[in-house]
């Protein structure tokens, strides 16, 4: 678990990653969902899908605090941001990622 980098030299990098996360999950992907006919359009769905993918199972078994992006370790947050960018660019299959996420959740 990250300690939120309070007072750390990593704090600016962490803040940048969190801002990227919020932009991609709250704005970029929901806007694209309208034009691409994706199975989800809500920000929390994109957050679930991306975090589940980087953990390889349900993320909520690993992250104690909420909101999750504030408590995910830096490496996984960076991986989730990168995956979100790949989804936005059409380089990762959101349908498949969502299906896997739902399967991990018993859906």
In which residue ranges do the predicted regions lie?
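Positively charged, phosphate-engaging catalytic surfaces used for nucleic-acid and nucleotide handling
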Residues: 1-107
